[in-house]
Design a protein with these regions (language model features):
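Histidine-centered, transition-metal-coordinating active-site segments
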Residues: 1-167
Length: 167
């Protein structure tokens, strides 16, 4: 968010932060859905439903037809295509949010993130992905095992670095 009295690099850094935050929110949330399918936390049907819910029926059908036309038979490849479609859609939504709120952004009165200002269909689908991520993905055994491994690696590295620094 732009802050009154800021100019030049300071203003650019705040705007850049908002753009990076939107990209981060989009990629991590949608990639978590894709990864949960690969880890078999979510079924293909659940994953397809979540990803296609970002689009109206007409676009959903076009995506399904494109998957057929491209002869994608592997479920993971289908999910990759749907994930890429969702990320592209959300990028365009954030651009639209930026353009719709450009005056507020420049005046320093813009509130929230770009994700907060996307269209209702996409916002509802995004919130559903967040809900599923918290209820099913982040609490699942495979994800917790990976997280625990990461903590163990960090603890080992800290011990090695501290030992090296002390000696």
């Amino acid at each position: 968010v732009y802050r009154r009295g800021m100019s030049g690099i300071s203003w650019f850094n705040i705007l850049f932060h908002n753009l990076v935050e939107a990209a981060d929110d989009i990629c991590y949330e949608i990639m978590d859905i894709e990864d949960s399918h690969k880890l078999k936390i979510l079924s293909f049907a659940e994953t397809e439903h979540l990803l296609l819910s970002f689009f109206d029926e007409d676009i959903q059908q076009k995506i399904r037809q494109r998957i057929i036309d491209e002869e994608l038979t592997d479920e993971n490849e289908k999910v990759v295509y749907m994930r890429a479609s969702v990320i592209g859609k959300l990028e365009n939504e954030c651009v639209a949010a930026f353009l719709a709120h450009e005056e507020e952004i420049l005046a320093g009165t813009f509130e929230g993130s770009f994700i907060d200002h996307i269209s209702e269909r996409q916002k509802k689908a995004y919130k559903e992905c967040e809900k599923i991520s918290y209820s099913k993905i982040y609490q699942s055994k495979p994800v917790l095992d990976i997280e625990l491994s990461g903590y163990q690696i960090m603890a080992t590295l800290m011990e090695v670095f501290i030992e090296a620094a002390v000696n």
